[in-house]
């Protein structure tokens, strides 16, 4: 199902609009989100692209993840440093700063899943 939008820039309010469906061949996706913004252009994820997400709360370092921060959703490359108790959500555009969470802030971060495919227009 197409659940709604996900920020590729400043996080946006997470809303479930799961009344549409999008088809993608040979993906292990559980749902799809529409990219909004340009923070992930270095990973070839552009504004308006359909991003297919495999639902999981475990994402490997360096994978692109859909993440909810309180009630706002964003798509970023995820890095976790357990010895420092630090999570970094890194954009793929130098115009944006990474989002860094430590200590108590980590309780406000929820991983929805990992990006497994992207579908968009030829550029």
Language model features with spans:
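Well-ordered beta-strand positions enriched in small/hydrophobic/aromatic, beta-favoring residues
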Residues: 33, 65-67, 89
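Short acidic low-complexity segments
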Residues: 53-60
């Amino acid at each position: 199902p197409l659940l709604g939008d996900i920020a590729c820039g400043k996080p946006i309010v997470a809303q479930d609009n799961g009344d549409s469906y999008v088809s993608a061949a040979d993906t292990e996706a559980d749902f799809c989100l529409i990219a909004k913004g340009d923070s992930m252009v270095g990973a070839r994820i552009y504004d308006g692209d359909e991003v297919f997400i495999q639902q999981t709360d475990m994402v490997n370092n360096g994978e692109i993840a859909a993440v909810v921060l309180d009630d706002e959703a964003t798509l970023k490359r995820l890095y976790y440093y357990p010895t420092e108790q630090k999570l970094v959500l890194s954009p793929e555009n130098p115009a944006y700063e990474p989002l860094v969470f430590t200590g108590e802030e980590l309780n406000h971060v929820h991983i929805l899943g990992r990006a497994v495919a992207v579908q968009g227009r030829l550029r």
